[in-house]
């Protein structure tokens, strides 16, 4: 759905997405919209459907894929399920897809740009999805225009840890903490979900959920960098800014994407679109 700019339309471009289907704010696109986007993206080699793990999207994309099968268009699916707060590590298939989609779009797009076949691009996209781990924290809700009211209620002196990008409940709600405390708790959740070592190479995304300004994001990135140094892991190509938002929500999300040589090369490959930036 809309409401998350620059995801999704902002990442259509060379070395990234070929097309995207957009619904209303926080609503899945229709089956026809999805089928039209797949037709536009199809150059004869098939289409990878790459999106977050949400029921409405899954249902509609599955039906769109069936429509395209009748037109002899091959397609495959990779679901992002990177939100560590939404389900346990043992039930990863139940997790929501959040800002890890940025890495999947970039790396799978680079693989397609290299003229890999559909099976290979799908493999790389799934590998990227599996390598991504995300968590968010919010201080304010956002307002969906159709509803005309906030997606949830929260006091001015409260925050919610693990909040979803549509206002889904997090893991706890309580008094606002200092930036260092918030960041360290988020990092603890991500590190507990991963097996990083002194030889690990990780790209980190410090993402504004909408209203959080760059100055505050870089304060949080400082903490992420320090914690990675403690682990001994090396940060590769950090991303700081607005990459996947939730309307005007005040909040932040962290995504850690553990890289091997294959994923790192594709992440660093050239890309050109309105919103892709590094640093």
Give the positions of each predicted feature:
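Short glycine-rich or small-residue beta-strand-to-loop segments that form or flank ligand, phosphate
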Residues: 1, 17-20, 46-55, 62-65, ...
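Gly-rich Lys/Arg/Thr-decorated short loops/hinges at beta-loop-alpha junctions or inter-strand turns
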Residues: 8-21, 85-88, 159-175
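Short, acidic/small-residue loops that bind anionic groups at enzyme active sites
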Residues: 20-25, 69-94, 230-235
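Short Gly/Thr/Asp-enriched flexible loops that form oxyanion-binding sites at enzyme active sites
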Residues: 58-72, 91, 216-222
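Internal, active-site/partner-interface "lid" segment
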Residues: 86-95, 105-166
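C-terminal non-catalytic interaction/assembly regions of soluble proteins
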Residues: 189-279
């Amino acid at each position: 759905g809309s409401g998350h700019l620059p995801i999704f339309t902002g990442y259509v471009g060379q070395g990234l997405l070929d097309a995207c289907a957009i619904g209303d704010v926080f609503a899945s696109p229709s089956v026809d919209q999805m089928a039209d986007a797949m037709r536009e993206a199809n150059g004869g080699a098939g289409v990878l459907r790459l999106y977050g793990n949400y029921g409405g999207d899954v249902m509609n994309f599955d039906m769109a894929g069936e429509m395209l099968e009748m037109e002899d268009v091959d397609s495959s699916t990779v679901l992002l399920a990177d939100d560590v707060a939404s389900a346990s590590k043992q039930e990863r298939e139940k997790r929501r897809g959040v800002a890890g989609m940025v890495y999947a779009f970039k790396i799978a797009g680079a693989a397609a740009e290299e003229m890999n076949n559909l099976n290979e691009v799908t493999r790389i996209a799934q590998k990227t999805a599996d390598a991504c781990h995300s968590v968010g924290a919010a201080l304010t809700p956002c307002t969906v225009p159709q509803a005309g009211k906030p997606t949830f209620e929260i006091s001015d002196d409260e925050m919610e840890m693990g909040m979803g990008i549509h206002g889904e409940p997090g893991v706890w709600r309580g008094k606002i903490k200092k930036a260092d405390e918030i960041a360290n708790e988020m990092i603890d959740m991500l590190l507990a979900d991963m097996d990083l070592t002194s030889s690990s190479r990780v790209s980190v995304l410090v993402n504004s959920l909408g209203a959080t300004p760059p100055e505050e994001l870089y304060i949080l990135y400082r903490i992420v960098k320090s914690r990675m140094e403690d682990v001994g892991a090396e940060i590769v190509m950090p991303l700081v800014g607005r990459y996947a938002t939730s309307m005007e929500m005040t909040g932040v999300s962290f995504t850690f994407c553990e890289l091997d040589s294959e994923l790192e090369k594709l992440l660093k490959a050239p890309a050109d679109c309105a919103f892709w930036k590094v640093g």
